[in-house]
Structure formats: C-alpha cells, structure tokens
C-alpha cells in the first residue's frame, strides 16, 4: 500500500507488570524470542538500534526498557535515543550522514515497525511523543494464568512461528492485488477512526487504521483455516476497535495536559503558590520591579513579563535536569493558539498595558487559568 506506518508502539507500565513478557510472546511469531532476549534496548546506542531496524525488513523491532535514571547524563542519553527513534519510525527516514571522504553514506531508514517499552515516557516534547501510540499496562493486565503459561509453551515449541509462516503463505498468492486492497481498506478504517476519535491527536487515526488493518488481515487468515468463524471475527474486531478508539481518545487528553502551554501555566501557578515568584497588584503597587517579580495582576488578568516569566520556567526545568520543550517564541504562539493568552488586535502574543504611567507589552492571561478555575 502507499501509506506506511508513521508511528511506533510504546508499551508503558511500571516495573513488574510483565510488559516485556507480553511483548516477548508477541514477538515469538517472528522468531525464538522471550522477555530476556528482545532484539534491542535503550542501553544500546542509537546507531545500533537504527542499523537493526534497517536489517529487520518487514519485521517488528522491539526496543525494551526505557527506565527512570538518577544520572542526568544517562537520562539525556536515553531521551536522545527516544527522540531519534520517534523521528525515524514516525517519518520513515534516516539522517543524512557523510563518510570520512565526505561522500554520502548510504541511508538506512527503518524497514519495519517498532515496539518500545518503558516505565516512563521520554521527555521529548509534543512532536516526538505524538509519533508514539501509547498503550498503558497495569499491574494486573498481564496476570500469570494457565493461558499465559500455555501460550509461552507454544512459543517455545515454535507453534507461533508456524502460524506466522502459514499467514505469509496465505498472503503470497494474493500479493499482486493486495496493495490496492490494503490501501482501500486502510483509507476506510482511517476515515472511520477520524469520526470516532474526536479530541485525539491528528496522528492517532492513521495509527489506529494501521493496527486494525493488520488485525483484520490476520483474522482473514484464521477464518480461512477454520481457527475462528466469521461471527467470532466480527465480534473480536468490534471489541478491538472499541478498545483502540477509547485508548486513542484518552491518549489525546493526556497529550493536551502535557502540551508546553499547559506545562508553562502549571509551572507559573506552582511558583506563585509557593511564593518563589510574585506578581504586583496594580491597584496597590507601583510599577517598580522587585526581585522575584514576574508581572502584575488585577481583578481580571495576570500580566506576565514575557522574558522574565519564560526564563523563570526554563530555569525551573533546568534545576530538575530537564529542558523546557519550546523556545519562547513558539511557546507564546502556542499560548495564543490554545486561547490561554489574549493577543492584541494584530494577533501579536503580547499586548500593551499601562503600568505606573508607562506602556509595556505583557502576556495577558485571564485569572482563571492561574487561579485554578478551569
């Protein structure tokens, strides 16, 4: 088909929830894998992982174990890998690089799909995390049951690999017409996903369509060999679709809460509450700036000093070993576009205000955003 996957699956769950067990079992359709011998991990270098992703054509590559780190250097190393991989799998591209003689090195873009796992989400900004389709795994979601043990025994005996071989043999005689059929089915699934995932990230419908396309094709094979009936396949498809729609919608809500604009407002609010910074009441104080002052307030608005407020939040992030994900200019645009600040008549992000007899340009923020009334 003409539409390649533009996402990586990210399995998110705390230690001990057996997410690697589930991933290893799924990967057993492609080889002799289990939780302890997955193809790659975040302890590998970015170049190593990308080379493996190029070699594993038409196969999933698992990158396991993104975990919290007390070492700032190690945390940033893993974040850099996550950022690199999100771009590579989200865009299907490879970085342009030169050889020692300055000639172009052959590109090695990913040629399969990626499954990553971690105890935490990488701090790689809006754009980076948007390329992940996140599945949360709770402590009780992968229980140790007879069914799990039986599935692991089947994987160990190579049963799952034989199922995948049968599926590929099922596809082979259909290869000439598959491209058009897959494209038509994918477009239909995406259109339906767009209707049903209002509020989700714009990338979510495409990811959902790709996942369900693969799911439905495997169902076609299982029906053809009598492993399930058409009625069972339809019921399972609708159930899986419902779960993915709900997950996509929830992921969209979480992403909005993690937008830099929301994080900026949350940081300012916290700094005001703990009195690390202050604002002057325009009905009482003059315009004289004091240490820790980041703006002004009246009955309706907070008026933040643009440079001071941005620098203060950036410093807060730096003190926590993080980098605020947007430049000042892009942040203010996002605040405007999200309806958090009131722009001037020309759409500029700062607006004139008379303070102590002087006209200054400030960020106008309705009080409800910082006082916790939204």
What are these regions (language model features)?
Residues 1-36, 208:
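P-loop NTPase catalytic core of nucleic-acid-dependent motor ATPases
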Residues 1-4, 28-41, 68, 88-96:
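Conserved helix-loop functional segments at active or binding sites
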Residues 25-60, 76:
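Short glycine-rich substrate-engagement loop in P-loop NTPases that contacts/grips substrate
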Residues 73-77, 86-92, 104-108, 113, ...:
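Extended alpha-helical interface modules used as scaffolds for assembling large macromolecular complexes
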């Amino acid at each position: 088909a003409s539409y390649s996957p533009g996402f990586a699956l990210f399995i998110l769950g705390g230690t001990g929830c057996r997410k690697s067990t589930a991933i290893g079992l799924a990967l057993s359709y492609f080889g002799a894998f289990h939780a302890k011998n997955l193809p790659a991990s975040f302890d590998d270098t970015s170049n190593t992982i990308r080379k493996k992703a190029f070699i594993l054509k038409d196969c999933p590559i698992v990158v396991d174990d993104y975990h919290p780190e007390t070492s700032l250097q190690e945390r940033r190393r893993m974040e850099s890998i996550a950022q690199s991989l999100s771009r590579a799998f989200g865009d299907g591209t490879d970085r342009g690089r030169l050889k020692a003689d300055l000639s172009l090195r052959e590109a090695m873009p990913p040629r399969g799909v990626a499954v990553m796992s971690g105890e935490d989400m990488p701090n790689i900004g809006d754009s980076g995390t948007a390329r992940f389709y996140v599945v949360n795994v709770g402590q009780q979601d992968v229980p140790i049951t007879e069914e799990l043990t039986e599935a692991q025994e089947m994987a160990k005996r190579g049963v799952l690999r034989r199922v995948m071989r049968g599926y590929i043999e099922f596809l082979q005689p259909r290869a000439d017409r598959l491209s058009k059929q897959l494209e038509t089915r994918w477009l239909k699934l995406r259109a339906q996903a767009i209707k049903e995932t209002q509020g989700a990230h714009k990338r979510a419908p495409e990811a959902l369509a790709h996942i369900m396309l693969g799911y439905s094709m495997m169902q076609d094979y299982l029906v053809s060999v009598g492993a399930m009936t058409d009625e069972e396949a339809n019921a399972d498809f609708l159930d899986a679709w419902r779960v993915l729609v709900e997950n996509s919608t929830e992921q969209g809500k979480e992403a909005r809460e993690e937008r830099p604009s929301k994080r900026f407002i949350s940081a300012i609010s916290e700094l005001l509450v703990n009195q690390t910074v202050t604002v002057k009441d325009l009905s009482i104080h003059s315009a004289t700036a004091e240490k820790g002052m980041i703006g002004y307030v009246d009955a309706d608005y907070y008026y933040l000093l643009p440079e001071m407020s941005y620098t203060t939040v950036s410093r807060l992030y730096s003190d926590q070993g993080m980098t605020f994900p947007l430049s000042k200019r892009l942040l203010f645009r996002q605040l405007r576009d999200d309806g958090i600040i009131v722009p001037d008549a020309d759409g500029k992000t700062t607006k004139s205000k008379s303070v102590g007899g002087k006209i200054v340009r400030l960020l106008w923020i309705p009080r409800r955003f910082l006082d916790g009334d939204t």
